[in-house]
């Protein structure tokens, strides 16, 4: 496997609009972001499920308003501008690759009214009287020309991000806005996300789309895809016994109730009780990653995918943090099987 060499590229300017419109680049030779056209023809499983719905970028542009900071009426960076900034950065870093159209999922719709409809009864409201925007949004897009196969599972390079307005103080003046962006791999068997340390920005703070673009470019250039694939590939050669797996699940349940001082001494574990239950059920019933054919053992690759699969029940604003934590857990457990002490508590 060859290491992907990402070459630095030069950025000119991005000029944001106060309207919810497509971003334009100053150089004419840059890929125009106006028509983000879909090359995806097959309907796939959603990359996140909990409380979300799929929308198009056209819906976000044409049917949704953009929130402002209330004290100075400065506009926030809109969902479409965020998506297009990251998508354009991907096209600049991977100019010879096929970059797919973004898949977008949203939740927590915020409804409002136009000023003219303030005093209307609800039953009399017309569609043009209503306003909406989505408090939480996640998107991702694949670069399917960069891929690997692990245990018969095709992994496509995938890029995306999360915006959650509930993490902003919209009642104040405009300041740095928070985003999450990632580059990693999507398991095409189940659409589970594989996120690594050097491919994830958990709290990116920027003032404008110029900052977003630059941060995305830097992340994509610094990400070591070959290293990420190497560590995931190592999972297929390690196995947990049914007893060790049961110990792990039991310790995860106990972890939630540990005294604070004891919990501080252990690695972080972000799964909820519901997700732990999903992992337990999937150990026997998952059609792709259960242990039925392997007796009482399960490969660490399958364990990893059970963890990332359970994460699909997370809300948008927690999804990437838990996806990254699933990688940490799988890597830590794998090392614990060979005597490393950091995660040993989870399987002892």
Locations of the language-model features?
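Intrinsically disordered, low-complexity regions enriched in serine/threonine
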Residues: 1-42, 119-348
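Feature for intrinsically disordered/low-complexity regulatory segments and propeptides
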Residues: 1-87, 95-97, 105
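A short acidic/basic microdomain associated with nuclease active sites
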Residues: 92-131, 135-138
């Amino acid at each position: 496997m060859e290491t992907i060499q990402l070459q630095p590229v030069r950025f000119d300017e991005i000029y944001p609009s106060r309207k919810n419109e497509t971003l334009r680049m100053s150089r004419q030779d840059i890929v125009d972001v106006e028509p983000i056209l879909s090359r995806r023809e097959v309907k796939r499983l959603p990359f996140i499920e909990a409380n979300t719905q799929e929308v198009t970028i056209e819906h976000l542009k044409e049917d949704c308003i953009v929130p402002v900071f209330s004290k100075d009426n400065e506009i926030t960076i809109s969902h479409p501008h965020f998506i297009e900034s990251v998508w354009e950065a991907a096209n600049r870093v991977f100019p010879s690759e096929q970059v797919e159209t973004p898949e977008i999922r949203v939740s927590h719709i915020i409804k409002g009214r136009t000023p003219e409809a303030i005093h209307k009864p609800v039953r009399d409201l017309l569609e043009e009287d209503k306003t909406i925007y989505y408090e939480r949004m996640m998107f991702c897009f694949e670069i399917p020309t960069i891929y690997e196969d692990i245990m018969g599972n095709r992994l496509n390079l995938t890029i995306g991000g999360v915006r959650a307005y509930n993490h902003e103080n919209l009642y104040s003046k405009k300041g740095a806005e928070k985003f999450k962006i990632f580059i990693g791999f999507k398991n095409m068997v189940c659409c589970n996300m594989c996120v690594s340390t050097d491919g994830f920005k958990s709290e990116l703070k920027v003032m404008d789309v110029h900052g977003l673009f630059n941060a995305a470019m830097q992340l994509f250039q610094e990400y070591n895809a070959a290293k990420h694939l190497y560590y995931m590939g190592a999972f297929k050669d390690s196995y947990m016994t049914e007893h060790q797996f049961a110990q792990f699940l039991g310790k995860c349940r106990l972890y939630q109730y540990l005294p604070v001082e004891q919990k501080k001494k252990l690695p972080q574990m972000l799964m909820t009780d519901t997700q732990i239950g999903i992992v337990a059920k999937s150990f026997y019933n998952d059609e792709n990653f259960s242990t039925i054919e392997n007796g009482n053992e399960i490969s660490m690759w399958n364990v990893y995918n059970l963890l990332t699969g359970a994460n699909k029940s997370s809300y948008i604003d927690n999804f990437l943090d838990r996806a990254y934590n699933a990688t940490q857990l799988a890597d830590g457990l794998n090392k614990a099987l060979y005597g490393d002490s950091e995660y040993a508590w989870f399987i002892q």
